[in-house]
Amino acid sequence: MEKRGVIDTWIDKHRSIYTAATRHAFVVSIRDGSVDLSSFRTWLGQDYLFVRRFVPFVASVLIRACKDSGESSDMEVVLGGIASLNDEIEWFKREGSKWDVDFSTVVPQRANQEYGRFLEDLMSSEVKYPVIMTAFWAIEAVYQESFAHCLEDGNKTPVELTGACHRWGNDGFKQYCSSVKNIAERCLENASGEVLGEAEDVLVRVLELEVAFWEMSRGGQ
C-alpha cells in the first residue's frame, strides 16, 4: 500500500473545502452541460489576468528551487511548468478571440485581486520553501482535479469547452502535479512544526481562494 503523505492527511482533515474547490458547482455545470456560457466567458477573462500574475510567482518558485531545495530535479520540474505557461497564455489569447473576450478591457474582480495579493505574499523571502511548494501544488492540483472531472466517463461537457478541460485535465498535467506534490512531500517530511503549520494554513487558504474564484465566475465578486 502506498504511503500516505502529509498533504493527503491535510486533504482528509479539510475534505469539505477541498471538495468545494475541486467539485464546485461551476465545474459540475461544465461536466453536466448546464454551464451558463456567460459564466465561462467571465472565468476566461479573469483567469487570463490571474495567469499573468501567476507567472512571476512561478518564476520565484524556480529561483527558490535553485537556491533552497538541495535537489536539482526540483528546478527541472518547475522549469517545465514555466515553459507550459507560455503556451497557456497563447491558448488564452486564442480562446479570447473565439469567445469575443477582449482581455484589454477585463478588470480583475475582488476574488482575483485577493488571489493576486496572496501570490505576492508568497514571493517573500521570509516564506519557507516547503510552504511555497505546498501552495504551488495546491494551485495546480485544483485545476487538474476539477477539469479532469469534466472529462470522466458520463460527462456531458459541451464540445466547445472540451479544449479547456483537456488543457488541465490531461494525463501529462496530472503527472506534473504529482511531481510537484512529491517535492512538497519531501520538503514537509523534515519540516519543523512551525513550518508544517504554515504550510497547512497556506493549503487551506489556496482552497478558499479557488472556491472564491469559481464563485466569481458564476456572478459573485
Swiss-Prot record:
Expressed in roots and shoots. SUPFAM superfamilies: Heme oxygenase-like (SSF48613). The keyword DNA repair does not apply. Substrate binds at residues 47, 88, 140. One of its GO terms (biological process) is thiamine diphosphate biosynthetic process. Disruption phenotype: No visible phenotype. It catalyses: 4-amino-5-aminomethyl-2-methylpyrimidine + H2O = 4-amino-5-hydroxymethyl-2-methylpyrimidine + NH4(+); N-formyl-4-amino-5-aminomethyl-2-methylpyrimidine + H2O = 4-amino-5-aminomethyl-2-methylpyrimidine + formate. Pfam families: TENA_THI-4 (PF03070). Disulfide bonds join 150-165. It comes from the Eukaryota. GO terms for molecular function: thiaminase activity. The active site is at residue 210. Pathway: Cofactor biosynthesis; thiamine diphosphate biosynthesis. CDD domains: TenA_E_At3g16990-like. Signal peptide: none annotated. This is Bifunctional TENA-E protein. It comes from Arabidopsis thaliana (Mouse-ear cress). The lineage of its organism: Eukaryota, Viridiplantae, Streptophyta, Embryophyta, Tracheophyta.
